[in-house]
């Protein structure tokens, strides 16, 4: 009897039936409920005017309206943008108060304005890179052929020994030994070199007598000397030999000359010549007639 009652109870309530382990089985889902849910969602979507749930979700989103700025607002915003392209929060709030706008609108305007400014800068740089700097500078710099017509690059003869510069004439002449006219002269020239530069070339040779034109080039003869004395003095002048030796030494570029030794030698030579050259004695005053300092020659009337 008891087993029969248990079988009837299990048949009436299958959810309360126990398994062999003693755990209750979950109730099986009914297919009729799922179909009912799908039918309810289809009815709801059909009742919407768009006909699909996606259109309904798009309409539920709030669309942002486009802000229309007045000329005064744009002028104020542009002036502030020229002064500061990245305003902070307090500055944006002040601008919003001045322009009667919200801080969010001001922030968005500055963001868009910065993007526009960067785009313009990039386009200008791209134009400069495409055009390059050769076009504006091409009219300023003349071509190479017009600047240097005589120096055609790459057109030299194949067996030419001298470049085109050798055919050009220059106002100054180059020497193979002395490059410059003053290269052979020392920085501190001794008196011998100065005397050699002042003596004419005709007086450099010891056996020649310079003419009157050469003497006039030296400043003329002294006023107390006769022309004959002048002409003879050119040969017997004590400075002629020293000048000739200095000129001969200066004319030879292969002789090493020490400026200190040459100056000392010239000074010694001049001292010897001054010692040999004697001047006439100057006559002194006539001697007194044996008179003491306290005695005076007084003429007495006769």
Curated annotation (Swiss-Prot):
Residues 62-121 bind DNA. It holds the Pfam family OAR. Keywords: Activator, Developmental protein, DNA-binding, Homeobox, Nucleus, Phosphoprotein, Transcription, Transcription regulation. A motif (Nuclear localization signal) lies at residues 268-272. It comes from the Eukaryota. The modification Phosphoserine is found at residues 52, 57. GO terms for cellular component: chromatin; nucleus. GO terms for biological process: cellular response to glial cell derived neurotrophic factor; dopaminergic neuron differentiation; lens development in camera-type eye; lens fiber cell differentiation; lens morphogenesis in camera-type eye; locomotory behavior; midbrain development; negative regulation of gliogenesis. This is Pituitary homeobox 3. It comes from Mus musculus (Mouse).
């Amino acid at each position: 009897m008891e087993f029969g009652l248990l079988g009837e109870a299990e048949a009436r309530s299958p959810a309360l039936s126990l398994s062999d382990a003693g755990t209750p089985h979950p109730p099986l889902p009914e297919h009729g409920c799922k179909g009912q849910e799908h039918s309810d969602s289809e009815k709801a979507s059909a009742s919407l005017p768009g006909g699909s749930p996606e259109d309904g979700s798009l309409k539920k989103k709030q669309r942002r309206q486009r802000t229309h700025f007045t000329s005064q607002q744009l002028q104020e915003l542009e002036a502030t943008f020229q002064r500061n392209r990245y305003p902070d929060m307090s500055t944006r709030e002040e601008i919003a108060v001045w322009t009667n706008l919200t801080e969010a609108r001001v922030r968005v305007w500055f963001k868009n304005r910065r993007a526009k400014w960067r785009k313009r800068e990039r386009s200008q740089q791209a134009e400069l890179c495409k055009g390059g700097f050769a076009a504006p500078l091409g009219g300023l710099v003349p071509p190479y052929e017009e600047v240097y017509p005589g120096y055609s690059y790459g057109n030299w003869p194949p067996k030419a020994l001298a470049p085109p510069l050798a055919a050009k004439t220059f106002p100054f002449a180059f020497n193979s030994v002395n490059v410059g006219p003053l290269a052979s002269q020392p920085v501190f020239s001794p008196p011998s070199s100065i005397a050699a530069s002042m003596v004419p070339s005709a007086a450099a040779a010891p056996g020649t007598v310079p003419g009157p034109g050469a003497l006039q080039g030296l400043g003329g003869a002294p006023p107390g000397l006769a022309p004959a004395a002048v002409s003879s003095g050119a040969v017997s002048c004590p400075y002629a030999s020293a000048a000739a030796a200095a000129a001969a030494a200066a004319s030879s570029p292969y002789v090493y000359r020490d400026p200190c030794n040459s100056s000392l030698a010239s000074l010694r030579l001049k001292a010897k010549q001054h010692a040999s050259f004697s001047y006439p004695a100057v006559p002194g005053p006539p001697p007194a007639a044996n008179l003491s300092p306290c005695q005076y020659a007084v003429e007495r009337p006769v």
